[in-house]
């Protein structure tokens, strides 16, 4: 049986398929105010990870969706990564997922139903890992494979993590190493070594379930997950929503193994340039190396966690319970000319 390589059937990969931040802002521009719906605690005003609707009993229902084209060749692994990525938005908001339904597009004239089933099975495995059902979905015949989830979650209102909740006295942490876009581009260019792509896959298939616990800590003010807009893009969203700036200590940012090697070989995804064109004017002057790493599109990336400097002990203790030995990669500051300074 011929080996199927799903990445050969798509023009983009993972969260690198995202529309650029600048173009997305233009598309979503509207004069309609969310104040028409007072129960909607979180909408699209501050580019949060999920919508939150107040149920009136101290809790809110969370709703989010995420889907993309294959970032790996194996069908089951693609489904698992896509589902893990979609679930991340619920954890980033401080919530717990309740159930999911699938979003599925398949080129039925090109790829078999057996391969399609493997994608769904991978998505179901991620949902089972999160303790929720994959309860249904919708499918279409599409030119390229597409898979993802719409996820419903729940959160205590006091634990709701909003982009606008950070202050200027936080340390910034990231829970996964970055470089997914560079490594998967190396895979597409057939330069990747098996061990390196395996490490990337393991990272992408790991749930950000720690977010639901971090949100209960008084010292954690907010979180967001790092996905298609890169570390700088998602950090800038929090800073702008909160009216603050941030310093990133570049050499403290953790990288997946051999990211620097593949970057030097020119394995730079096109989305990195699009990302920087959208928000580069908000960033201090940076080197090509810094730009190519910090704007690299992540798929199922880690959580950016904003922790009050006075409350690190409880955060470190909680992180270690999830096997996370974290160090700050930066800090927030009062608002300055540049939203982010890379040091």
Swiss-Prot record:
Its cofactor is Mg(2+). Keywords: ATP-binding, Kinase, Magnesium, Metal-binding, Nucleotide-binding, Selenium, Transferase. Pfam families: AIRS, AIRS_C. The active site is at residue 15. One of its GO terms (biological process) is selenocysteine biosynthetic process. The record marks 18 as: Important for catalytic activity. Homodimer. Belongs to the selenophosphate synthase 1 family. Class I subfamily. Synthesizes selenophosphate from selenide and ATP. This is Selenide, water dikinase. It comes from Sulfurimonas denitrificans (strain ATCC 33889 / DSM 1251) (Thiomicrospira denitrificans (strain ATCC 33889 / DSM 1251)). The lineage of its organism: Bacteria, Pseudomonadati, Campylobacterota, Epsilonproteobacteria, Campylobacterales. The gene is selD.
């Amino acid at each position: 049986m011929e080996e199927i390589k799903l990445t050969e059937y798509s023009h983009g990969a993972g969260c690198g398929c995202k529309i650029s931040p600048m173009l997305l802002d233009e598309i979503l521009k509207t004069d309609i105010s969310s104040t028409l719906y007072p129960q909607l605690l979180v909408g699209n005003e501050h580019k949060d990870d999920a919508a939150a609707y107040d149920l009136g009993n101290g809790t809110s229902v969370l709703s989010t969706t995420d889907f993309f084209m294959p970032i790996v060749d194996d069908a089951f692994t693609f489904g698992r990564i896509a589902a893990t990525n979609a679930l991340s938005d619920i954890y980033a908001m401080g919530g717990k997922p309740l159930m999911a339904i699938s979003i599925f597009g398949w080129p039925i004239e090109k790829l078999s139903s057996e391969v399609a089933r493997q994608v769904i099975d991978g998505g179901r495995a991620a949902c089972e890992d999160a303790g929720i059902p994959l309860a249904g979905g919708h499918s279409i015949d599409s030119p390229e494979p597409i898979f993802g989830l719409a996820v419903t979650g729940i959160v205590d209102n006091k634990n709701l993590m909003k982009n606008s909740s950070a202050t200027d006295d936080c340390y910034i942490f990231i829970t996964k190493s970055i470089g997914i876009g560079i490594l998967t581009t190396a895979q597409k260019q057939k330069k990747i070594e098996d061990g390196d792509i395996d490490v990337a896959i393991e990272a992408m298939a790991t749930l950000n379930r720690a977010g639901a616990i971090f949100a209960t800590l008084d010292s954690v003010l907010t979180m967001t997950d790092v996905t298609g807009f890169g570390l700088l893009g998602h950090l800038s969203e929090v800073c702008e929503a909160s009216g603050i700036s941030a310093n990133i200590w570049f050499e403290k940012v953790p990288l997946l193994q051999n990211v620097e090697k593949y970057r030097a070989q020119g394995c730079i995804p096109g989305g990195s340039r699009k990302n920087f064109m959208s928000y580069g004017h908000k960033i201090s002057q940076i080197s090509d190396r810094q730009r190519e790493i910090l704007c690299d599109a992540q798929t199922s990336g880690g959580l950016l966690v904003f922790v009050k400097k006075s409350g690190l002990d409880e955060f470190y203790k909680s992180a270690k319970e999830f096997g996370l030995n974290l160090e700050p990669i930066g800090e927030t500051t009062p608002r300055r000319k540049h939203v982010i300074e890379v040091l």
